[in-house]
Curated annotation (Swiss-Prot):
Belongs to the ABP1 family. Gene3D superfamilies: Severin (3.40.20.10), SH3 Domains (2.30.30.40). The gene is Abp1. InterPro entries: ADF-H, ADF-H/Gelsolin-like_dom_sf, Drebrin-like_SH3, SH3-like_dom_sf, SH3_domain. Actin-binding adapter protein. Binds to F-actin but is not involved in actin polymerization, capping or bundling. Does not bind G-actin. Does not seem to be involved in actin-based lamella protrusion during cell migration. This is Drebrin-like protein. GO terms for cellular component: axon; cell cortex; cytoskeleton; dendrite; growth cone; lamellipodium; neuromuscular junction; postsynaptic density. Residues 431-445 have a biased composition (Low complexity). It is found in: Cytoplasm, Cytoskeleton. It comes from the Eukaryota. CDD domains: ADF_drebrin_like, SH3_Abp1_eu.
Length: 531
């Protein structure tokens, strides 16, 4: 049902106008229903504002209020229409009066804002003012005006007349460019200083890093040396340590393939070491036996680099009886015609011994003068040169040749012994004269005969050793690719290098002597065999 204003319209309109009148003290009026009817009436009016209105509101009824509030910013009066629905009001009554607010707002016109309220908190003054500020313009009539604006000068222009003499002042320009140049120099110096400091910092970091790495490498080398086996490696040239295989935890991280490879390398090194040791022992044995046989069965060769002339003459006199003919053994008796057994002929000294004595005396007297002129320092040099003569092959022994002769040849040699002794006498005289001339010429040149002969023999011996060493290079191969040794058991080579003394110990890995003199393993598919 609709609301009814017929019975109390005059009182309602009078109360509404009192609130609208600015000269009236009444600033609020409250309206309600008579009993359970829809007839609207005036409940109360007052001038105490919103706080006084809250005292007359009943939480169990439906009521309407028209309020006047002064805006503190603008000083203007604002009017509110409040639709009060108490929390304790019957629900059916709320539904019935829900549509009455439209008719009431038409009667009580002039309100700036219509709000719904259910309790006293909804009618708080601050909340009402905040809602009014959102629906009204932001006026500030009562706010104090700002300070008096400063007096403004007459409107002018920024144009200034160009004065060429002032604009083109040379001194000002020079000062400007000098200032710019000084600033540029300062900037460059600051930039150089920053670069220098940065470079110094980088060098310091690099130096500290290198020192740290050097200490780590030393520790690594010490730990690796302790873990190395006790055998002596065949290779003599140093090989770079592999950082992967010298790590402290390398022994624990070996794979099966690496263990097999190391075992194979160890076995190959032991085999090569045994072969080299046996070869060295055999070479030493043969060399010592050859020297002993040469000393027992042969006379010393007449070499000026080894002995002095006086020593040669003494040896010649001592070995002269060895050149005597060997007595022929008795002939065996023939079974057909027996002959008397003849006693063996005694060993008769060669007739050349007697004439050799004056020759030796003459030679000794001649050599004595030469020996006095020679410095004493030549003797150690001759002794040192004797140490290198063991590698030389001893000359053919005369006694061996005599022993190999038949008895008939021995008999014929006895007949020619006298003639041979005379020829030896002449030969000795010739050698003495030549030696004296050589000693005098060497003395004038500033070098002794022993030094020259020792140097000549050393060169000859070195050539002989090189020929003996390079005579057998074994199986050779030429490198097709370059290879870098992974550890100390392998060799390094470049394309075109020749590898000698190759031992094909495995299908994929061979051993040989590299171009740098090291002996070790290398991959077989990196080389080709040289025929």
């Amino acid at each position: 049902m609709a609301v009814s204003f017929e019975k109390n319209r005059a009182q309602i309109v009078a109360a509404w106008k009192d609130v609208l009148d600015d000269k009236s003290d009444t600033n609020w009026s409250l309206f309600g229903y008579e009993g359970q009817t829809n007839e609207l009436k005036v409940v109360a009016t007052g001038d105490g504002g919103v706080d006084e209105l809250n005292e007359d509101l009943n939480s169990g009824k439906i009521m309407y209020a028209f309020v006047r509030i002064e805006d503190p910013k603008t000083g203007l009066n604002k009017y509110l229409l409040i639709n009060w629905q108490g929390e304790g009001a019957p629900v059916l009554r709320k539904g019935t009066c829900a549509n009455h607010i439209r008719d009431v707002s038409n009667l009580l016109s002039g309100a700036h804002l219509t709000i719904n309220a259910r309790n006293e908190d909804d009618i708080d003054l601050d909340r009402l003012l905040k809602k009014l500020s959102t629906v009204s313009s932001a006026y500030s009539f009562k706010e104090p005006r700002g300070a008096m604006e400063e007096q403004k000068a007459p409107v002018g222009t920024n144009y200034t007349r160009v004065i060429p003499t002032k604009e083109l002042n040379a001194s000002v320009m020079q000062d400007f460019w000098k200032k710019e140049e000084a600033e540029e120099k300062l900037r460059q110096e600051a930039e150089k200083e920053s670069k220098r400091l940065e470079l110094q910092k980088l060098e310091q970091e690099q130096r500290s890093r290198e020192e740290k790495e050097h200490k780590e490498r030393e520790k690594l080398v010490i730990s690796t040396t302790k873990l190395q086996p006790a055998h002596v490696p065949i290779k003599t040239s140093p090989q770079p340590l592999s950082p992967e295989k010298t790590a402290p935890g390398f022994a624990n991280n070996l794979t099966d393939a690496e263990r097999m490879r190391q075992a194979r390398n160890q076995e190959a090194r032991e085999l090569i070491g045994s072969r080299v040791g046996a070869a060295k022992a055999m070479f030493t044995k043969h060399t010592s036996e050859g020297q002993l046989q040469s000393k027992l069965n042969t006379q010393p060769p007449a070499k000026p680099a080894r002995n002095s002339i006086a020593q040669r003459i003494n040896v010649f006199n001592q070995n002269q009886p060895q050149d005597a003919p060997v007595p022929s053994p008795p002939r065996a008796a023939s079974p057909a015609k027996p002959l008397p057994v003849e006693a063996p002929e005694p060993v008769v000294p060669a007739p050349a011994i007697a004439p050799a004595a004056p020759v030796a005396a003459e030679v000794v007297s001649t050599i004595a003068e030469v020996e006095e002129s020679q410095p004493v320092d030549d003797l150690p040099l001759a002794h040192e040169s004797e140490q290198f003569s063991t590698i030389k092959r001893s000359p053919h022994s005369k006694s061996n040749s005599l022993q190999s002769q038949s008895p008939d040849e021995t008999t014929s040699s006895n007949e020619t012994d006298t003639a041979v002794s005379q020829e030896q006498e002449e030969e000795v005289r010739t050698k003495v004269s030549v030696t004296v001339q050589q000693s005098q010429s060497v003395k004038s040149s500033g070098m002794s005969t022993l030094e020259r002969n020792a140097l000549t023999d050393l060169v000859n011996e070195d050539d002989f050793i090189c020929q003996e060493t390079l005579g057998d290079l074994g199986q050779r191969a030429r490198a097709l690719y370059d290879y870098q040794a992974a550890d100390e058991t392998e060799i390094t080579f470049d394309p075109g290098d020749v590898i000698t003394h190759i031992d094909q110990i495995d299908e994929g890995w061979w051993q040989g002597l590299g171009p740098d003199g090291t002996y070790g393993l290398f991959p077989a598919n990196y080389v080709e065999i040289i025929n």
